[in-house]
Amino acid sequence: MEKVQQTIRAPRGTELQTKGWVQEAALRMLMNNLDPEVAEKPEELVVYGGIGRAARNWESYNAIVDSLKTLESDETLLVQSGKPVAIFKSHEDAPRVLLANSNLVPKWANWDHFRELEKKGLMMYGQMTAGSWIYIGTQGILQGTYETFGEAARQHFDGSLKGTLTLTAGLGGMGGAQPLAVTMNGGVVIAIDVDKRSIDRRIEKRYCDKYTESLEEALAIANEYKEKKEPISIGLLGNAAEILPELVNRNIIPDLVTDQTSAHDPLNGYIPVGYTLEEAAKLREEDPERYVQLSKESMTKHVEAMLAMQEKGAITFDYGNNIRQVAFDEGLKNAFDFPGFVPAFIRPLFCEGKGPFRWVALSGDPEDIYKTDEVILREFADNEHLCNWIRMARQQVEFQGLPSRICWLGYGERAKFGRIINEMVANGELSAPIVIGRDHLDCGSVASPNRETEAMKDGSDAVADWPILNALINSVNGASWVSVHHGGGVGMGYSLHAGMVIVADGTEAAAKRIERVLTSDPGMGIVRHVDAGYDLAVETAKEKGVNIPMMK
């Protein structure tokens, strides 16, 4: 990948570079994904998650920008793995952009084949929100991480992480949310990363409190704050596959253990034991096969240590990076003895059609987001947990790129909020249109047997019809852009998932599209879980009037 040193920043204000606000939204969100405040390696078009890119290469990026600038309001741009391939006449209620990223026929859906295609310039890895142009920085996963640790606290620690120590690793674009999510729940956390730049970035953005290169110092600080029952987050420079076994040997067992290293990609995401970043980069280039094998061996040691900690009493869970699968394939037959975070903590929310709903102020004015915060606090005042999240986010979350907010809203709530936002744009309360979207990690848009659909009640973990149906219904209902991706979160061969974005531009046409899309999208989550036999989903469907032909 050619590196290009240029600073990309989304335009602000109300002056259009395109022929309509929906096209403008797509352009600004693509550019926002590559803002240095947002992206992990913008010079390589990498947004987050190892090699999750916004466009296939710089030539494709420039062609996408040019296409969006000339796209009519009754045309649709097609993007194939980060490359613009066609513009067709459609209609004003159709999506302005349709994206398909990283999709491979199942028999060939593996990293080796993907890398062959990538080398030839035929494919890119879109992760989830990188290639679908709706990444908002670490805040994008923060509330989900907060909810996960909050539910762990409710199940195991009397509702709070006060006086507990969490041990984790991985402080990239996704994992970087962990330190703040733990301290928001009152706990102490040691978060390990091999890359000092990642820790520095989290400290700079106020997601992490302290930095150290010493395990002894990290433990001393952690013990001090644990005894005081005060929250603190410590970024520890090192390799988790070395540090976790060392702690097991010393019989130092945390209360909670998880991991968010980029284990989904053994070549580009994980650093083997005994290698500096520079040495790893050299080996990756010279002998990728040996690199991958060393990575897998290190991951196996990492998982062995997590299992040992679980055996000694630590609440241990997988945070969706496929590290258990790698260890299992390497011969560690009990790798799946600790659960994934979705079946352990999140699935009841999915049954209610809840998931990570986000919105972005295209104006670039933080005041627009603060006004929408007030809407949440007013309209959902009976949901104290949600309101508490909004108040904490306002105080503690620093915007990256265009101002944005995330919160978990359910069926009915999303459409209600979307209607209000559109009205606020129409009457001038907000200074420019708002982009509404979500992560692909949502209640009805993913098939991922080692993550979102792990341990489904009816055994339908690997059924991938659901994300396809999700993308189809959102497209016909008028989402502004819709994406279908493969391999996000857990790597090639292990997931299919869909994303959607809808623009609230204040028009009556947008109001109708918002009502349709923000009903069908979370509705798919309820439908998917009703079909799998979850009683809570059935109750929710009946209460909300979701029409499911064979529901009993």
Curated annotation (Swiss-Prot):
Task: Give GO terms for biological process.
Answer: L-histidine catabolic process to glutamate and formamide; L-histidine catabolic process to glutamate and formate
Q: Which reaction does it catalyse?
A: 4-imidazolone-5-propanoate = trans-urocanate + H2O
Listed PROSITE patterns: UROCANASE
Q: Which residues form the active site?
A: C407
An example Gene Ontology molecular-function term: urocanate hydratase activity
Q: In which pathway does it act?
A: Amino-acid degradation; L-histidine degradation into L-glutamate; N-formimidoyl-L-glutamate from L-histidine: step 2/3
Q: What is its EC number?
A: 4.2.1.49
Keywords, alphabetical: Cytoplasm, Histidine metabolism, Lyase, NAD
The places in or outside the cell where this protein is found are: Cytoplasm
The record's section on Pfam families has: Urocanase (PF01175), Urocanase_C (PF17392), Urocanase_N (PF17391)
Q: Which GO terms describe its cellular component?
A: cytoplasm
Question: Which annotated residues bind NAD(+)?
Answer: 49-50, 127, 173-175, 193, 239-240, 260-264, 270-271, 319, 489
Which EC class is the enzyme in? lyase
Record family assignment = Belongs to the urocanase family.
Entries under HAMAP family matching the protein: HutU (MF_00577)
PANTHER family per the record?
UROCANATE HYDRATASE
Concerning NCBIfam families, the annotation shows: hutU (TIGR01228), PRK05414.1 (NF003820)
Q: What is this protein called?
A: Urocanate hydratase
